[in-house]
């Protein structure tokens, strides 16, 4: 084996072992202190829920914060293909590929397609302590696949990925340090947004960085070893190889597009005001929104105020609507039909309803599931 390659293998093995050891040890201590819930108790309010995450820039980061990383992944793949035939850029080909693979494999496959789907950790807003319906699970505690997609944080990976620019240390230490700072800073911002929105714990964000770092180490030291390509000369590529590369790149671009489309953040808010007749003696809500998603407040208002927030992930062009209709029976029962409708594909959707009702209906309110 080439001594240089052997050296990379050894360095990679040591770094990966240390990296995972630090992450596992820190997580054990973190869980012991119950730090995830301690922090979230300072953010969540029984009265206002996760309202801190509704403001800016947190909403903007949730809806659009992943776009820069997706765009750079596209550009890196195309740059890698062009660099294969460019004497000026040939030495950077493995660097371009390193970024692309770290993004596609680390963020796309390991985090979003594997860990989030199969670890079964409920999001903070889904656990009983914070107004949800499920049992809390600590980081690295496996749950029921599909019952929660909190671990790790997908949005956070799209911030931390920029730290992979540290690979340019041999060419420009300032660029490498700047990229590292950008990645850690942007990843922290994305993490804060998701924390305030009740979508993730601190440990979810911590492990997003952990997975991205481990993926980067594996590709850098065991697979690509970019510095060894600095002296490589441009070689003529056969038409057959070109077509294979084009097909491979196209497949990767399709994969990126699918991952982006199905993990595209979605948020919609509806408010409905329902007038209540003086003859109304009882309110019957007939709805397809589960009872555990309703937060009812009896206040000094003259009418019924309904606020519904729908958030999750949706395919482009998908949308959400809310139909509300009323009917007063001769017995004084006002039936309010609340029908939540989705159009398109939603890999994940959470609905939360805040209902303000006149005090006179405090013991005269019932909820009936809407028949399928």
Predicted segments — roles?
Residues 25, 29, 74-78, 105, ...:
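Alpha-helical membrane-inserting segments
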Residues 2-3, 45, 77-95:
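Membrane-helix interface linkers and caps
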Residues 23-27, 105-110, 185-195, 257:
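Aromatic-anchored segments of alpha-helical transmembrane domains
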Residues 93-105, 238-265:
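Internal/C-terminal transmembrane anchor helices
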Residues 261-282, 293-372:
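Acidic (Asp/Glu) and glycine-rich low-complexity loops/linkers
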Residues 38, 87, 91-181:
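Membrane-interface loops
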Residues 2-76, 116-123, 128, 133-135, ...:
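N-terminal transmembrane-helix/juxtamembrane module of multi-pass inner/ER membrane proteins
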Residues 2-9, 15, 137-246:
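Membrane-embedded catalytic cores of phosphoryl/pyrophosphoryl-handling enzymes
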């Amino acid at each position: 084996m080439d001594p240089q390659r052997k050296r990379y293998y050894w360095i990679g093995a040591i770094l990966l072992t240390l990296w995972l050891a630090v992450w596992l040890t820190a997580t054990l201590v973190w869980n012991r202190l119950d730090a995830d819930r301690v922090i979230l108790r300072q953010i969540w309010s029984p009265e206002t829920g996760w309202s801190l995450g509704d403001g800016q820039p947190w909403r903007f980061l949730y809806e659009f914060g992943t776009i820069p990383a997706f765009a750079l992944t596209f550009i890196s793949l195309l740059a890698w293909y062009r660099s294969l035939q460019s004497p000026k850029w040939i030495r950077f080909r493995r660097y371009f590929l390193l970024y692309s693979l770290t993004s596609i494999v680390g963020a796309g496959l390991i985090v979003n397609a594997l860990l989030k789907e199969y670890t079964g950790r409920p999001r903070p807003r889904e656990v009983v302590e914070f107004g949800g319906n499920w049992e809390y699970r600590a980081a690295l505690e496996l749950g029921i696949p599909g019952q929660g997609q909190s671990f790790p944080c997908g949005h956070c990976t799209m911030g931390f990925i920029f730290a992979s620019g540290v690979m340019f240390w041999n060419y420009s230490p300032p660029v490498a340090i700047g990229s590292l700072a950008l990645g850690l800073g942007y990843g922290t911002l994305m993490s804060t947004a998701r924390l305030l929105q009740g979508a993730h714990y601190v440990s979810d964000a911590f492990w997003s960085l952990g997975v991205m770092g481990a993926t980067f180490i594996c590709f850098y030291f065991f697979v690509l070893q970019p510095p060894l390509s600095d002296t490589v000369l441009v070689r003529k590529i056969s038409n057959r190889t070109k077509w294979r590369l084009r097909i491979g790149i196209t497949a990767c671009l399709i994969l990126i597009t699918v991952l982006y489309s199905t993990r595209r953040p979605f948020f919609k808010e509806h408010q409905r005001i329902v007038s209540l007749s003086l003859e109304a003696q009882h309110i019957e809500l007939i709805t397809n929104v589960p009872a555990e998603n309703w937060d009812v407040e009896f206040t000094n208002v003259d009418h019924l105020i309904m606020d519904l927030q729908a958030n999750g992930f949706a395919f482009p062009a998908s949308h959400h609507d809310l139909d509300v209709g009323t009917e007063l029976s001769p017995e004084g029962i006002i039936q309010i039909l609340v029908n939540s409708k989705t159009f398109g594909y939603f890999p994940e959707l959470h609905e939360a309803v805040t209902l303000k009702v006149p005090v006179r209906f405090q013991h005269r309110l019932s909820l009936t599931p809407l028949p399928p």
